[in-house]
Amino acid sequence: MGNVEVAWEDVISVINMVRTHLIIIAIAFIAMIAVMIIVRKKEKLIKRMIRFQSFFAFLLITVVTLNVAAAETLYNTLNVVLSDKGTLDQGHIDNSKKVIEDVTNEGVVMTKNDNSFLPIVPQKINVFGWSSTNPVYGGTGSGTVDATTAVGILKGLENAGFETNSELSDMYTEYRQDRPVISINDGQDWTLPEVPAADYSDKIINDAKDFSDVAMIVLSRTGGEGTDLPIDMGPIMDGSTMDIGTKYTKGTYTNNSKDYDDFEDGQSYLELSKTEQDLVDLVCSNFDDVIVVYNGANAMELGWTNDYEQIKSVLLCAGAGATGFNALGNIISGEVNPSGKTTDTWLKDINKAPYINNIGHFAYTNTDKVSDAAKKAWERADGIVSFVDYVEGIYVGYRFYETAADEGLINYDDTVMYPFGYGLSYTTFDETMGELRASDDGISVDVTVTNTGDTAGKDVVELYYDPPYYNGGIEKSSVNLLAFDKTDLLEPGESETVTLTFSDEDMASYDTYGAGHYVLEHGDYDISLRTDSHNVVDSKTYNVAEDIVYDENNKHNGDVEVADNKFDFVEGDITYLSRKDGFANYDTATAAPTNFELDGTIYGNGTYDPTDYDNDDDKMPTTGADNGLELFDLRGASYDDDRWEDLLDEMTVDEMVDLIAFGGHQNIAVRSIDKIRILDTDGPAGVNSSTLGIFGTGFCSEIILAQTWNTELAVAFSEAMGQEFADYHVTGWYAPSMNIHRSAFGGRDFEYYSEDSKLSAEMAKAEVEGIVNAGMYPFIKHFVLNEQEINRNAFLTTWSNEQAMREIYFKPFEDTIKAYPDGKIAVMSSYNLDRKS
């Protein structure tokens, strides 16, 4: 996990940039060799002189050519690599480590604690599971964390005063020291190293029993940029070739035993392997008090934790960065009371999710010339032109499960393991909901939270709404997160009143097939206080007397331009899931794709000849003008200031080309407008750039941050990160990532916040606030519909309806941009073909 990867495409790109220079050097080299061969029969003195002259000429040509390349073609690239990078301030490092631990203290989620087993006093503890010695600290790709100096799980326990069984940890490190690599460039090794149960000798088990009565099992799952987690491990186990329409990612797997396969056909990466299942059986048959720690960002199937009475407690702890695993020791010992809440719905059987047939590898067949364009865009795609259908529409995550349960489509308890917004504490809270109050600032409600237990703790206050649904009309979920907040640390008996404010516009739905605008339909809106998406504490009714349409005369939520239908072209010929008649079309809508014919418009967009659009009457824009302007002159100027046109007229075509072509990890200098060069860097996990040669503290994953439900912590999180960026003279940050957890198999789920758009939006706004406070600008990403990593570079066509796009996938971006109307943020696009969005 600590390896920093260099993209092979970048290497090829640099080689292509200097290809002409390399050809010149190669010709000079061949000429030198030819001369040396020709003069081989000359007199010795003459031969030496000619050979020396030819070698000197070759050397001179090489030096001059490389200097030209460095001064012109590679000028900006070398500037990035060779310029002064600055050094990290130790105070900033110390602050980062503290913030990471603070975030993880609140971001670990306790989902089970039978008989209040936890906390326990620091004592000896047996920690089982290979991942206890090599946990997941982050993800791969842009979210890579340098784990070489990070606090591991065992060290985190020891720092809290626990003593761990070294006989077990020694066995695991001897079994394997390195974690298999899920690489963006070099393939994926999905192996889950685990010592087979048969290899635990009687001595090891008996020694463990003598060491402690308490056992912990650590299991991990990892993911990363460029690929999604396997839905079916069977083809990976047997090395099958990826075929059109199959639902698995490429990769390899090495079994832990020669006696059995770890997975059977049809089992997913998010189920227990046989070796893991055997380990759970072994531990639970020898210990009565077992703690399970799941170290992963993707919502794994954990129904089995209820099948063992020995499993007393379950803790969810995704990639924890440099110091986050201290939080496990803090929580288990009771030094910290867990207050994290889930940001996704966790299922007992993921194969029953509505998206399951519509994620993964799906390729069009009638691609012809488009395949040639795809190969040029990304050679490793092998000409694949792919697609993914967002068939569930707005019914993503809890929006589906809560609504489907209300409509009688599913049995909730049989389907859902942990609701969205769920998490346990060592104490209990009483929440009292006040009356709704309407004012010019919106609608407010006070919630008084009282700690009714005997341990200090924090509580998350969650407010949801259930809009009136008219059968066959605008699609609506029966449960929607409306607002939330987190209390301060409340001592036993202490109370705090939290005020939650929202607007009636927040409850409007986008009416794609009727008004073509946002609409707040008439009727009663149930505003409910809940402990999670499923369990209601109290509710109030808010009535809307008549339909309100947010059109040109009444724009929605501060829109500059009216929100109207703009994305018919993204909808495609897809049957989308509808609540009509109790989800009557569920089977049809959620079935696997049957149409693999590429849309004619997209085919044309991939094969057109741009010269067909040349027009001899077109006039060349003004370039290279002397208008007496510098970029600094327009600092703070509005977007519509006429001087921008004059400034652009001063730039040359070459400068414009270079500004775009050399835009990776920097924003180059432009001499004509006296623009200085500034540095950008990638990654939500902090400074970790092989391109720039700078490395800093590894921050915990964004899902840990989101599970805090604490926006103040999110501000502190990115502000601390921004201080390290500033030490390295970095100004732009390729983050935060705010795509949606559409499925549990998303390779970059660790890098995104949640399945919910509201929670994602609030956390994103907070992170942007922190990074702006540090003097930087973020590149919020990946706009838009970037929920799948498989085939992301293979002309991926994403199909979705406009209501889902606006209410689910656009919302984090929309709310963040609206929060910064002065333009302090940039946007990174996705790779898919829905760029017009």
Give short role names for the model-derived ranges.
Residues 1-512, 519-528, 532-533, 556-837:
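Glycoside hydrolase catalytic-domain context in secreted enzymes
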